[in-house]
Amino acid sequence: MKKFNKVLSVVVASAMVMAMAGCGNTDNGSAATGTNAATESAAADNGAASGSVFKIGGIGPTTGGAAVYGLAVQHGAEIAVEEINAAGGINGYQVEFKFQDDEADAEKSVNAYNALKDWGAQVLDGSTTSGACIAVTDKTKEDNMFQITPSGSAVECVQYDNNFRVCFSNPNQGLASAQYIGENGLAEKIAVIYDSSDVYSSGIYEKFVKEAENQPFEVVAAEAFTADNKTDFSVQLQKAKDAGADMVFLPIYYQESALILTQAAAMGYAPKWFSCDGMDGILGGVDNFDVSLTEGVMLLTPFAADATDDLTQSFVTKYKEKYGETPNQFAADSYDAIYVIKAAIEKSGVTPDMSVSDICDGMKAAMTEITVDGLTGNGMTWTADGEANKAPKLSLIH
């Protein structure tokens, strides 16, 4: 069985502060409530004794083509909430968690946010994908609700002072990828295949190409596709092959990546492959895909499920026992997001009986003062503009 192997931590330019992120763009309350019923009822029972609970909402796609991301975010958060409640809660208060499906759609994500507000959410873990997250930031800003996205990587996902993220931002993924490839001499000629209609993909691409000008390799082909034309990549691959590219950089999601790897193999094209966190999920998320084609694929991602540290092993064991599968980076990001929320609440001293706005003000101030050791980084800190400081890592599929 193939797996990710964390081969080393990437040390980028010493002057660079890395901010880590993940993905790019209905209220399905009955499904979300059903999934979270045990978490909510247990917290409610325990919270009744203390008179109050912290209510954390989550948003992401649990149905549709991006469901692998939203379900991972939901499940990672649920494990963190269960651990926190079992350990006595946050400053003695239990936590309730409710997750809403948005199908990775901006309008539906806003609807999901409104449903969570009606439920009484005080803090938001989400949205999962960038396009949906950007839409929700406008609403959380209006309400002054604290929002931390585990995986929304677009720059605009942290455009307001109440917005924070756990993951890499798109530009910094592109920057770090170009630097790693160049500093380690992985390729001389690189082709890029990216989705010009997607904020995640195009954001990484733009920064990668700009940084490539400073690196000892040449971008010999930059081939785009769009959401309306993402099944046949023969033209893009042929141009990469004809240009002599010995590496193809794929700042895209795993569904399209699987098609590209399959079609490249069929035409006898075998370059090195380098990607980012959007490819996480390719080993188990694509039907009828020959996973042997991923052999040697390199990913810039903050989490490896086969890492040997105690925290990762504990999380992976719990996740497999509860959900029957290996967690991906999005699950780890969301797990960390809940613990970041916990740390900010503890540092600020806010309580559940305070208004959403007062809770947010306290947590915002605390975010630049906390340090969190998590699944996706040790000694993580945050800047006032919402970005996480932590070292990126490279994983190799073998």
Language model features with spans:
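Extracytosolic ligand-binding ectodomains
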Residues: K2-K3, G24-I397
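Bacterial N-terminal signal peptides that target proteins for export
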Residues: M1-V11
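C-terminal motif of bacterial Sec signal peptides marking the signal peptidase cleavage site
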Residues: M18-G22
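Hydrophobic helical h-region of N-terminal Sec-dependent signal peptides
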Residues: V12-V17
